[in-house]
Amino acid sequence: NKLDRFIPKKLSGTLDAAFAKGFALIFEKGTGIIEKTYNKEKKKASFKINTYASEVMADKQSVRNFTKQAKSAKATNLLVSSVEGIGLGLVGAGIPDIPLFAAVVLKSVYEVALSYGYDYQTDEEKVFILKVIEVAMYDEEKFVQENDQFNALIDQIVADGDTMDGYDVDKEAQINLTAKALSHEMLYTKFLQGQLIIGIAGGIFDPVYVKRISNYAVLK
């Protein structure tokens, strides 16, 4: 890539650490703050209503209501991400943008989860969400390989009664895997976003990645 010669050698490691720290901090202290940006109980109630409707009506439209709710939340989060990414790009803030970006990503996935009746409080649920984000960031052959493995895991979870109880989960290890996937994919955009004059070019890609992750979350 033509940008390679301009990018500091330590930037990849710095991004890895920034993403890992961002996720760890949000899981420790930030989930409650994120939940203030939407009505969790209302979303749970909507899921119950949609579930009842799908059982009674048993038609395609009632089933689509789950996806409709998830897409509505996704659209809002894309707007938030656009403002956040471009706004900080204008002032050349690439690395400082990462905790905010991570928060928007988690907010989007949380709302998708609630739309389908899932929560995100346990370590098992957090690891699953992190895996969704990780796999969504891969391209081509790597994506196919990781997606197939993830689908196999999901099939096993469903076979076990839709629970991850008893699974060996390592939240810290998954945080690091997700951080590496994000930093590898976003290396060039975060470099651009950190430049005062052309930062907006990097910031434009934040909503692109949020959409990519949200779309993948809807599928899972």
What role is predicted for each listed range?
Residues 104-108:
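Structural signature of FAD isoalloxazine-binding scaffolds in flavoprotein oxidoreductases
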Residues 84-96:
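Transmembrane alpha-helix interface/packing and boundary motifs in multi-pass membrane proteins
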Residues 1-83, 110-220:
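Terminal, membrane-proximal amphipathic helices
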Residues 97-102:
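Hydrophobic alpha-helical membrane segments of integral membrane proteins
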